[in-house]
């Protein structure tokens, strides 16, 4: 919104001298003609009263109702940084309630309330103040203001976006050629920003950013350059709003002692950067972090950082002309939202920072960090746009709406805004993968959905060892995991050998006389865990496979025959829990199988 737009809005709201009259005291009285958009409104009388009190005009156009500018205002509209975004407005709240709240912190230049066809608001508005400090005060004091009982307003900074992203540009085109071509088809072009390819500095990255003199000029250019209408150099182009640069508080920027270096050669090492930036004061560089063709240089003091920036900006390092600026801090909450949107996940990201409340953004125009190829910017593959805390302009010219399916209030290309990787170097988690920890033990699923951990029963040990069993701790190596859980289970039972007790225990275990339901499935190997234990009678010999191996030399093993010598226990591994009562008496205790054989 420009001053010219506001002036025309006032003219529309006061179309003729007859629309207002003067009282005997000489003060204007706006009561003869009600502006379009106010007439027929649910609170028409309250809006007219507000206009009479303040002297501001009001008109509705392009889906928004504009209140302002102040009477007698001359000159251009307030500079960037004077506008705020107001969200979470109840749909039946209008200017007569909003204006008194927001004019309490400063002089309002203009308020734009987004309206629906049914006469209700769309839940958000933009308020522009005459001074930057008034807008900052509004964000600080009116965020979470209770406009109605239990209804809180959301207030944050808004950015007057004047920059467009244009993709599909031939990579051989220079900045001057792009500026000339774009100026032929659009008006109000101020500058063109082009970045060299990371691999070949003689080529561009296939896209550029065009800066316009006003938001209105940028909006008109965007409408004219929409895909399918105009081709540049015979190529189909992609046009959208560029992500506006975040306005960082001046007090915060005065504390920054980290430099952002852009347009480096990929081969340039961190050591070369350390030497180059540390030449003005040896030892002043604390850390260098290089990511593809850009880097962050940390200094011990801000003065050293400023000296290096002033001397090295625009110079060449290994044949490439570099750009050096102070790194802009980004609020941690906003950074987390950037991460969630860019990664396509709702999981929160833990952020660490060297300063109390900020992490540092890197090149707002590179796709290097996120790793998206350029073709994701064109056509239907534009699903990674970020959702920032700053809010773009309303529907005036830009036709921007609330959060759409792309999850962005800005509706524009993020252009790969990366965040300094020092604060998010977490690697992608590998998918969980099960491993067999017994190489020759087959676990068969008896349920088409999944394996439910079964149980196995050990006779007469429940009272003797009530708490002896515990889950095996996880092992780091897969090969260790194949052996360690079983050893962990056996060790608590490693009692001194007692032949008499062993024989008595063996006598308790009855022979299996009925055919098992899994006959024909060889169970191998089966181990006898203690010597002097009688084998199951020959009637059940068919249950053993050819790999049966009695272990008779271990003097420290206890009476663990029921664990793996008995066929019923082996049957439990196959999921046939119904077969277990045939081999075990009632005096048993239960132990989950997954505590013995875990998968990792």
Curated annotation (Swiss-Prot):
- What segment(s) does the record annotate as region Disordered? 1-37
Indicate the family of this protein: Belongs to the RRM RBM47 family.
List the GO cellular component terms: lysosome; nucleus
What is the protein's given name? RNA-binding protein 47
Question: Which intervals hold domain RRM?
Answer: 82-160, 162-244, 257-329
Q: Give the protein's biological function.
A: Single-stranded RNA-binding protein that functions in a variety of RNA processes, including alternative splicing, RNA stabilization, and RNA editing. Independently of its RNA-binding activity, could negatively regulate MAVS by promoting its lysosomal degradation.
Gene encoding this polypeptide?
A: rbm47
Report the subcellular localization: Nucleus; Cytoplasm
SUPFAM superfamilies reported in the protein's UniProt record: RNA-binding domain, RBD (SSF54928)
Q: Which Pfam families match?
A: RRM_1 (PF00076)
Biased composition range(s): Low complexity: 1-25
The domain comment in this protein's record states: The RRM domains are required for mRNA stabilization. The RRM domains mediate interaction with MAVS.
Q: What happens when the gene is disrupted?
A: Morpholino knockdown of the protein prevents head development.
Query: What is known about its subunit structure?
Result: Homodimer. May interact with MAVS; may regulate MAVS lysosomal degradation.
Q: Which GO terms describe its molecular function?
A: mRNA binding
Q: What induces it?
A: Up-regulated upon viral infection.
């Amino acid at each position: 919104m420009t001053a010219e737009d506001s002036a025309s809005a006032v003219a529309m709201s006061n179309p003729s001298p007859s629309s207002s009259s003067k009282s005997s005291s000489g003060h204007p009285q706006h009561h003869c003609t009600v502006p379009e958009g106010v007439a027929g409104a649910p609170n028409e009388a309250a809006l007219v009263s507000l206009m009479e009190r303040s002297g501001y005009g009001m008109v509705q156009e392009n889906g928004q109702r504009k209140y302002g500018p102040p009477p007698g205002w001359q000159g251009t509209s307030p500079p960037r940084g004077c506008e705020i975004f107001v969200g979470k407005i109840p749909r039946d709240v209008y200017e007569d309630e909003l204006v008194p709240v927001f004019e309490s912190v400063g002089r309002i230049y203009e308020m734009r309330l987004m309206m629906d066809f049914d006469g209700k608001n769309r839940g958000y508005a933009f308020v522009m103040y005459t001074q930057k400090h008034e807008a900052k005060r509004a964000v600080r004091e009116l965020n979470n203001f209770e406009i109605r009982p239990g209804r809180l307003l959301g207030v944050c900074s808004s950015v007057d976006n004047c920059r467009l992203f244009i993709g599909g540009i031939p990579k051989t085109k220079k900045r001057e050629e792009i500026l000339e071509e774009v100026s032929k088809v659009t008006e109000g072009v101020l500058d063109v920003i082009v970045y060299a390819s990371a691999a070949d500095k003689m080529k561009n990255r296939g896209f550029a950013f065009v800066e316009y003199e006003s938001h209105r000029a940028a909006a008109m250019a965007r409408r004219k350059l929409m895909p399918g209408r105009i081709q540049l150099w015979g190529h189909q182009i992609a046009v959208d709003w560029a992500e506006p640069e975040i306005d960082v508080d001046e007090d915060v920027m005065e504390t920054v002692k980290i430099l952002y270096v852009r347009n480096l050669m990929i081969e340039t090492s961190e050591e070369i950067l350390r030497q180059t930036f540390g030449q003005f004061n040896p030892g002043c560089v604390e850390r260098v972090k290089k990511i593809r063709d850009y880097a962050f240089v940390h200094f011990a003091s801000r003065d050293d950082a400023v000296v290096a920036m002033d001397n090295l900006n625009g110079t060449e390092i290994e044949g490439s002309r570099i750009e050096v600026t102070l790194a802009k801090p980004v609020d941690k909450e906003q950074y987390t939202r950037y991460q969630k949107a860019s990664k396509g996940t709702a999981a929160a990201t833990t952020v660490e920072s060297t300063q109390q409340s900020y992490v540092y953004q890197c090149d707002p125009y590179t796709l290097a960090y996120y790793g998206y190829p350029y073709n994701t910017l064109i056509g239907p593959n534009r699903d990674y746009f970020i959702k920032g805390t700053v809010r773009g302009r309303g529907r005036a010219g830009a036709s921007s709406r609330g959060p759409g399916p792309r999850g962005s209030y800005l509706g524009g290309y993020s252009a790969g805004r990366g965040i300094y990787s020092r604060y998010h170097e977490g690697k992608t988690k590998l998918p969980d993968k099960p491993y067999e920890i017994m190489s020759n033990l087959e676990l068969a699923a008896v349920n088409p959905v999944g394996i439910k951990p079964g149980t196995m029963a050990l006779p007469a040990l429940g009272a003797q060892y009530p708490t002896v069993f515990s889950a095996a701790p996880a092992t780091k190596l897969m090969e260790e995991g194949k052996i360690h859980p079983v050893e962990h289970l056996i060790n608590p039972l490693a009692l001194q050998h007692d032949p008499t007790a062993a024989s008595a225990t063996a006598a308790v275990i009855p022979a299996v006389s009925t055919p098992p339901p899994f006959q024909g499935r060889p169970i191998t190997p089966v181990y006898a865990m203690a010597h002097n234990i009688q084998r199951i009678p020959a009637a059940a010999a068919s249950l053993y496979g050819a790999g049966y191996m009695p272990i008779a030399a271990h003097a420290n093993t206890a009476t663990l025959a029921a664990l793996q010598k008995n066929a019923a226990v082996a049957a439990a591994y196959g999921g046939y829990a119904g077969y277990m009562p045939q081999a075990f008496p009632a005096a048993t205790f239960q132990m989950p199988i997954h505590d013995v054989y875990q998968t990792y």
